[in-house]
């Protein structure tokens, strides 16, 4: 594999959309000192613009309650502590409006270890009061200029029964009430949804289309659309149990093309596209997350999808993430760029390298990304090998790694330079492996089978 570059090559400006948004699990986790320490490191070393998380209206945040007469009461202490910190580290929210406070929740249906209420409100007027009071409080505390740059996302994954217990039409009503409440404070605020996901990406797209059609029919504002393009699906095994499977190598490229096409040909062609969750899988106990594989996976997909969407938020920056409860070990297959102790995983360095690359494109392909920054040529190389069929099967075969010879030739480079090698920068060794069916870690040195990830319940 040979690459030839000329330092004098022309470069094309692009928007580094992959640095727009980083994600985390649950608002209340953001009050913890170790969570804040990890996020401060991420911002110092990488630097994202937005952050997105679940559960700002969970009862642990104590925002909403009612007096003895059933009138809404609002409490902002924990909210202010969290958002003051986010402002300190230069992050703006993609503000996911979830979940339902127990005081106005219909028959409780909770999900996750921290029990988010995935139900519609008993009283849509009280929900509107909560949303409007939150927006007004944000304007009063942080100023209209700051809040105008925020994004307001209505709910999370309402097309999945575990996240929304009622019908599609009921979610559309929630969006209608919510967007009107927000726009009543200032019509310039950016509001969107539906934050759809799914075991089958076609279901995700169908929900998105129906949502856009509803907004158009009701003449509702739609400033951005959001979705979650995980590269997985959930087929049934021979016993009828769901098992996580992996789509094709280029599924994310195809999915983002489809979303882009839907918006371009919709009544909202100028709507932004924010993909507010993304990872190699939607399982918080997928041991692949702790291996080398996510790094070349990210480098390939993030560089190949430049120019298609406005953000693609990595889920999540830390393994301090408790949807399934606290992680059982230091490396438990958590989503994070860092583990619970703050150890940077290979996925972390994928983002770190991209952050160092600048935003003037010289060249890209499956294993290479070249840019110019400050009149300097930056070249990033990796070896991207997708999942093998053996990932899903028992195998007695030894594991094989495929070495790739890369020849790099640079013309018109007259200054002294140092090509940093693997020995000099160990963390730059992000080469993929042909068969990703071994796990790195003391507990998993010689596994014969990967533990199968399970869908969230």
PLM features: what roles do these ranges have?
Residues 1-110, 114-151, 169-195, 220, ...:
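Non-catalytic accessory regions flanking glycosidase/transglycosidase catalytic cores in CAZymes
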Residues 25-37, 59, 70-77, 102, ...:
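Acidic-and-aromatic substrate-binding clefts and catalytic sites of carbohydrate-active enzymes
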Residues 66, 70, 114-122, 162-166, ...:
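Short coil/turn segments at secondary-structure junctions
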Residues 90-93, 107-118, 157-159, 227-240, ...:
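A short small-residue
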Residues 138-142, 162, 215, 260-263:
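Structural motif corresponding to the C-terminal cap of alpha-helices
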Residues 168-312, 330:
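Noncatalytic carbohydrate-binding groove/subsite architecture in carbohydrate-active enzymes
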Residues 318-320, 326-327:
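Secreted, luminal/periplasmic, and some membrane-associated catalytic domains
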């Amino acid at each position: 594999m040979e690459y030839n570059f000329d330092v004098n090559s022309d470069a094309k400006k692009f928007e580094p959309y992959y640095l727009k948004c980083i994600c985390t699990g649950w608002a209340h986790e953001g009050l913890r000192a170790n969570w804040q320490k990890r996020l401060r490191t991420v911002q110092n070393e990488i630097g994202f613009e937005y952050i997105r998380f679940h559960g700002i209206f969970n009862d642990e945040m104590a925002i909403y309650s009612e007096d003895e007469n059933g009138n809404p009461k609002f409490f902002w202490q924990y909210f202010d502590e969290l958002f003051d910190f986010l402002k300190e580290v230069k992050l703006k929210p993609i503000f996911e409006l979830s979940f339902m406070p127990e005081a106005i929740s219909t028959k409780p249906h909770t999900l996750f270890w921290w029990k988010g209420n995935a139900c519609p409100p008993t009283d849509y007027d009280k929900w509107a009061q909560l949303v409007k009071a939150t927006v007004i409080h944000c304007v009063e505390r942080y100023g209209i200029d700051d809040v105008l740059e925020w994004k307001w996302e209505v709910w999370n994954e309402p097309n999945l029964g575990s996240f929304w217990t009622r019908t599609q039409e009921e979610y559309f009503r929630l969006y209608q009430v919510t967007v009107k409440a927000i726009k009543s404070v200032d019509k310039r605020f950016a509001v969107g949804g539906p934050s759809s996901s799914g075991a089958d990406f076609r279901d995700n797209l169908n929900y998105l289309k129906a949502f856009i059609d509803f907004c158009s029919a009701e003449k509702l504002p739609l400033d951005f659309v959001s979705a979650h393009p995980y590269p997985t699906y959930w087929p049934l095994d021979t016993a009828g149990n769901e098992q996580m499977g992996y789509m094709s190598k280029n599924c994310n490229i195809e999915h983002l093309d489809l979303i882009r096409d839907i918006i371009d040909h919709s009544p909202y062609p100028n709507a932004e596209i924010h993909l507010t969750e993304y990872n190699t899988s939607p399982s918080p106990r997928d041991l692949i997350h702790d291996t080398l594989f996510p790094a070349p996976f990210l480098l390939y997909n993030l560089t190949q999808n430049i120019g298609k969407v406005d953000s693609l938020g990595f889920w999540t920056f830390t393994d301090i993430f408790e949807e399934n409860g606290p992680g059982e070990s230091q490396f438990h297959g958590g989503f994070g760029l860092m583990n619970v102790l703050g150890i940077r995983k290979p996925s972390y360095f994928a983002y770190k390298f991209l952050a160092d690359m600048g935003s003037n494109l010289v060249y890209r392909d499956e294993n290479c990304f070249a840019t110019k920054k400050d009149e300097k040529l930056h070249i990033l190389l990796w070896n991207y090998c997708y999942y093998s069929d053996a990932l899903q099967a028992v195998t007695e075969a030894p594991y094989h790694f495929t070495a790739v010879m890369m020849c790099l030739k640079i013309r018109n480079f007259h200054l002294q330079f140092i090509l940093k090698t693997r020995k000099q920068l160990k963390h730059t060794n992000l080469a993929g492996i042909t068969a990703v069916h071994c796990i790195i870690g003391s507990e998993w040195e010689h596994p014969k089978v990967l533990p199968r990830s399970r869908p969230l319940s």
